[in-house]
């Protein structure tokens, strides 16, 4: 789940 959250954050940034 950690990598998934990171991906979402990267998309927003």
UniProtKB/Swiss-Prot annotation:
<keyword id="KW-0027">Amidation</keyword>
<comment type="similarity">
    <text>Belongs to the frog skin active peptide (FSAP) family. Temporin subfamily.</text>
</comment>
<feature type="modified residue" description="Leucine amide">
    <location>
        <position position="13"/>
    </location>
</feature>
<keyword id="KW-0044">Antibiotic</keyword>
<keyword id="KW-0929">Antimicrobial</keyword>
<keyword id="KW-0964">Secreted</keyword>
<dbReference type="GO" id="GO:0042742">
    <property type="term" value="P:defense response to bacterium"/>
</dbReference>
<dbReference type="GO" id="GO:0005576">
    <property type="term" value="C:extracellular region"/>
</dbReference>
<keyword id="KW-0878">Amphibian defense peptide</keyword>
<protein>
    <recommendedName>
        <fullName>Temporin-AV</fullName>
    </recommendedName>
</protein>
<comment type="function">
    <text>Antimicrobial peptide.</text>
</comment>
